[in-house]
């Protein structure tokens, strides 16, 4: 989502652009938004399918539209990762599906998530939407914390046999925002319970403090 948001902000693509769906995108396995080969789908709907429905088909369709092919998009992903300082991340595909050479760390996921929240707030609004209907198929957002905790406004679930049940969650209470990353959980319930505990701990024992006012000159020591 970060790269697509950046491309939109730079006017390289538009949310209203219509993307021709390839056979590769259409036949993706795992969670899908159920796009159809040969049809055109807007970037806006593909983003919703990616963020809300965790659609692997949407991920590939967007990758192909932005870069021409998924493999070239992966190269772009790794360039962005380097710029963002994601030192323990190497992408091999656009979906996060298992690959022996595809890896990241919980810290890098937190850094990436924070960058998306800070740099593209209007795009981040998508992550709190609870459902999306496409092709008459209604799917709920897989992030159940959106229903459990009203301060939670994102972000993303994930699951593979190797990584277990994962969740990046973000919440804001008063003027303080927290981002949590849970990986390797043994069940769907476990990842949400662990994330909720981390959020409660963070909001209880930490506080945001303003050290300086913005746009004010500091006194020189000389």
Locations of the language-model features?
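Domain-terminus/edge residues, biased toward the C-terminal soluble/receptor-binding domains
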Residues: 86-87, 98-222
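Active-site-adjacent loops and short helices of periplasmic peptidoglycan-processing enzymes
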Residues: 1-107, 114-119
